[in-house]
């Protein structure tokens, strides 16, 4: 098997195996080939990982932020040196095209290590508060053992987005990747050890639905950060709430992307395509409800159809390929069921909706699909599909489209395309979403906070704001005179 790791888990600085765990097969989505076979963590493996993290964390927390940051910056250097190797592994693990992974996956993980490694000394500070003769000061202190639970769309990036702020803040982490994409996080753990990270601080264990509760409910875990679906997020948040654990939830969305009639048409179409077809549509922040002002609807659709049908679909390891397969057969079948619902409920199929002709029969491919004449009540306009399916809806005016855009349980992202920047900012203020883009879409540099509102989650990944979710504030009051007591 061409991507078989040394063992299933990485604990306390070394690979660990326990063949008693349920078998997890990593499948290359383009061909159906089994590229690795691993085992889910047994309760004993979970205990071993958490114990290693708990043992290593206090000494790590006692180091200066500068010293911790230096190690993370070295890890970033190593990731960049091995970008090709890591990108090919990510492509095998997920099915995403190499032309995408080589610029967007390990590189964004390296950016995260570099950013947090550099910003920590200045960001992990407190305040001095004069109180007359007395004074107080505050300091940010680490939480302890943190659990990261990843999704299968950006496995290496998510491991770094959670690991970097947790580690630089002085915590230890046990990270569980998705069972669909188990390989990349193991390489991140290897690189961190090579960069000088003390053993036990970043542990990776494999698992399935039975593993998550063992981690979330463990009494030594102080924090859980999840990237996943809304139903999973509710279960994890509920379990964490029972023990008052800290949580960050980055969940799903059904985000609106609004195109006004004065927008640059090519840019708006490009933004809509990036917000629906990048990573084969498997991006939580995708703008899958594309509201197009009625005046430009048909020109928009005509050009969108032309550009969509020119997308190169094929072998993800071919650098000419622009769109790869879905991550799994189960996800492909789920997306096809939504396409069927769109047709049945009266949406107009503009393009796509089937299997490409030029691909392996064992691959989990779907044509990029565009529906028009979609109405707000249709299933494809209400539920997260998580595949390359774009819904185009008509609108007439600003007030109407804002109300319709907000009429959803989700609130992860939103986008606005218009030449009128005054209107752009006004609309952005009124849209109920945690992350918004104006005249672009789905750009998430590490310098800016990323996260949602409503049922799309809470807390933020990236930027200095993320450090607040991996630390808590300690206040110290210093008395400078005798204590006055009425006793």
From Swiss-Prot:
Q: Which Gene3D superfamilies does this one have?
A: Aldehyde Dehydrogenase, Chain A, domain 1, Aldehyde Dehydrogenase, Chain A, domain 2
Q: How is the cofactor bound?
A: Binds 2 potassium ions per subunit.
Matching entries from SUPFAM superfamilies are given as: ALDH-like
- Look up the record and name the pathway of this protein: Amine and polyamine biosynthesis; betaine biosynthesis via choline pathway; betaine from betaine aldehyde: step 1/1
Q: Which UniProt keywords apply?
A: Metal-binding, NAD, NADP, Oxidation, Oxidoreductase, Potassium
Annotated positions binding K(+) 1? 26-27, 93
> Residues where Cysteine sulfenic acid (-SOH) occurs?
284
Q: Which domain of life is it from?
A: Bacteria
Which reaction is this enzyme known to catalyze?
Answer: betaine aldehyde + NAD(+) + H2O = glycine betaine + NADH + 2 H(+)
> Binding residues for NAD(+), per the UniProt record?
150-152, 176-179, 229-232, 252, 284, 384
Q: So where does K(+) 2 get bound? A: 244, 454, 457
**Cross-referenced PROSITE patterns, in alphabetical order?**
ALDEHYDE_DEHYDR_CYS (PS00070), ALDEHYDE_DEHYDR_GLU (PS00687)
Task: List the molecular function annotations (GO) for this entry.
Answer: betaine-aldehyde dehydrogenase (NAD+) activity; metal ion binding
Q: Give the residues annotated as active site.
A: 162 (charge relay system), 250 (proton acceptor), 284 (nucleophile), 461 (charge relay system)
What family, per the record?
Answer: Belongs to the aldehyde dehydrogenase family.
Q: How does it assemble?
A: Dimer of dimers.
Q: What is this protein called?
A: Betaine aldehyde dehydrogenase 1
Q: Which organism is it from?
A: Rhizobium meliloti (strain 1021) (Ensifer meliloti)
This protein's gene is called betB1
């Amino acid at each position: 098997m061409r991507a078989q790791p040394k063992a299933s888990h990485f604990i306390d600085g070394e690979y660990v195996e326990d063949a008693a765990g349920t078998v997890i097969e990593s499948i290359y989505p383009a061909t159906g080939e089994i590229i690795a076979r691993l085992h889910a963590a047994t309760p004993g493996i979970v205990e071993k990982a958490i114990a290693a993290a708990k043992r290593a964390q206090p000494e790590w927390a006692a180091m200066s932020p500068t010293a911790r940051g230096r190690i993370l910056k070295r890890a970033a250097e190593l990731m960049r040196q091995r970008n090709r190797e890591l990108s090919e592994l990510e492509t095998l693990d997920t099915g995403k095209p190499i032309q995408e992974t080589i610029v967007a996956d390990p590189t964004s993980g390296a950016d995260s290590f570099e950013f947090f490694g550099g910003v920590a000394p200045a960001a992990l500070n407190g305040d001095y508060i004069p109180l007359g003769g007395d004074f107080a000061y505050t300091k940010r202190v680490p939480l302890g053992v943190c659990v990261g639970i990843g999704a299968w769309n950006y496995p290496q990036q998510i491991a770094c987005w959670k690991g970097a702020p947790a580690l630089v803040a002085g915590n230890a982490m046990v990270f569980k990747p998705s069972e669909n994409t188990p390989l990349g996080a193991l390489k991140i753990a290897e690189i961190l050890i090579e960069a000088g990270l003390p053993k036990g601080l970043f542990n990776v264990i494999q698992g399935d639905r039975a593993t998550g509760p063992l981690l979330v409910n463990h009494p030594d875990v102080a924090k859980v950060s999840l990237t996943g679906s809304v139903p999973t997020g509710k279960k994890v948040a509920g379990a964490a709430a029972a023990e008052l654990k800290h949580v960050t939830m980055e969940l799903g969305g059904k985000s609106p992307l609004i195109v006004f009639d004065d927008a640059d048409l090519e840019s708006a179409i490009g933004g809509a395509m990036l917000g629906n077809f990048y990573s084969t549509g498997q991006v939580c922040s995708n703008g899958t409800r594309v509201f197009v002002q009625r005046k430009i609807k048909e020109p928009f659709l005509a050009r969108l159809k032309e550009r969509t049908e020119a997308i190169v679909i094929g072998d993800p390891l071919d650098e000419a390929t622009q769109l790869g397969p879905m991550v799994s057969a189960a996800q492909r079948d789920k997306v096809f069921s939504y396409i069927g619902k769109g047709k049945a409920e009266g949406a107009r199929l503009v393009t796509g909706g089937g299997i490409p002709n030029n691909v392996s029969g064992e691959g989990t491919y779907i044509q990029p699909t565009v529906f028009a004449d979609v109405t707000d009540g249709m299933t494809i306009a209400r539920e997260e599909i998580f595949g390359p399916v774009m819904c185009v809806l008509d609108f007439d005016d600003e007030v109407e489209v804002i109300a319709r855009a907000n009429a959803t349980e989700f609130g992860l992202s939103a986008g606005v395309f218009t030449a009128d920047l005054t209107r752009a900012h006004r609309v952005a203020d009124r849209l109920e979403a945690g992350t918004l883009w104006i005249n672009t879409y789905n750009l998430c540099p590490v310098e800016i906070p990323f996260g949602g509102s409503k049922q799309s989650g809470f807390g933020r990944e990236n930027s200095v704001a993320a450090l607040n979710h991996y630390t808590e504030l300690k206040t110290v009051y210093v008395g400078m005179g005798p204590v006055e007591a009425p006793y």
